[in-house]
Amino acid sequence: MKSDDSVWFTDPPFGILGNYEGHVATPELPTNVYRLDKSGQLTVATGDINRPNGLAFSPDESKLYVVEAALNPRVIQVFDVTDNGTKLANKRPFINAEPGGTPDGFRVDVDGNLWCGWGMGNEQQDGVKVFDPTGKPIGFIALPERCANVCFGGVKRNRLFMAASHSVYSLYVNTQGVKGG
């Protein structure tokens, strides 16, 4: 959720690619980054990304970070937020995952650091990787399983919740998640 009460989301096809329910489904809409404003109007913020996944705004909402999951290895792209906060432009790589690295859902703290769910079943990568506002790795929280998503919670937004393959973990951190994220 953005401060203007718009909801931004991606619609990747991951859950429908297989034959899990007895048939292979097809996407209803292209895999874009979408914006739903408070009046209910849905628009495409950008179509310039292949299989977008996790996304989060910078603390000042001038940038949007988005995982581009079709690339191998995956890349967290960064876009400038333009047109009075309604569109995205100037896509560029922000974090290139090393081979085998799989960034997924992530959140941003008040200092602009990215806390990224990460991994694909190996103990050197499974957990949460933390990157500073320039994309430099500054921390790692090891988990015994792949971490798919994270969020900050608690009264002070200083508790990190980590949704992993089979478990939810949490710990208190020395920062706060951005409001709304």
Name these PLM-found stretches.
Residues 16, 42, 64, 73, ...:
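Flexible, glycine-rich phosphate/dinucleotide-binding loops
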Residues 30-51, 80-98, 128-143:
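Blade-edge beta-strand/turn elements of extracellular beta-propeller
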Residues 12-14, 69-71, 81, 119-121, ...:
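Short loop/turn segments immediately following the C-termini of beta-strands
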Residues 123-128, 138-140, 148-151, 158-159, ...:
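Short active-site-adjacent structural elements
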Residues 1-7, 14-15, 27-33, 41-63, ...:
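Beta-rich, blade/repeat-based domains predominating
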Residues 78-86, 172-180:
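Short loop/turn segments immediately following beta-strands, especially the blade-tip
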Residues 72-81, 87-133:
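Loop/turn-rich, solvent-exposed surfaces of beta-rich toroidal or solenoidal domains
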Residues 16-30, 69-75, 120-125:
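Short, solvent-exposed loop/turn segments at conserved positions within beta-propeller repeat blades
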